[in-house]
Amino acid sequence: ARGPSSALTSSPVAAAHRILTNAMACMPVDLYRKDGSRRESVEKHPSLYALTVRANENMSPYTFKKVMESKCFWYGEAFAYIDRSGPLMRLIPLPDAHQMYEDEQGGRWYSFTAETKELDLTRKFHEDELLHLRFETGNGRYGIGILQMARDAIRTDLLSQKYAGKFYKQGARPSGIIEVPTKLDQAN
């Protein structure tokens, strides 16, 4: 498969994507604070508004979570800029393509090229400025998406569909003979 648009032509992949992204988008968000070995629910936190009422001026929390989960599904990870500059925190999804750098102290920096009104064309973010979600991961740092994990299976399914389409398009009429050990009549 060459990417999400190609993979979405596979019915099982499209169904899995739709089911997973819709389910994740509907999930309620609860925040907890660790206090030693116990967790306590947090009722007031700057991120609660963005996660439960309005992610940004263009997205509801449902849409934001669906977009982020979709990026995770396809590419293994999703990034959103945590904008703390206004009276309310905003979460702005970032493009999929990025470069990661580490500084001498071990801090991670991510460079994105964006085409949005809110951000510069190319911008570098420290990991503390980002919400970083991963689909599957082997090391906790990088995500692995369905396109990478199931590349061969998706490709096989798409090629099978293509073959079957050509087979029937060329006038194929599969037929065969079925043999049974007894005589068939109207009663059976």
PLM regions with names:
Residues A1-N188:
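Structured, contiguous alpha/beta core segments that scaffold functional sites
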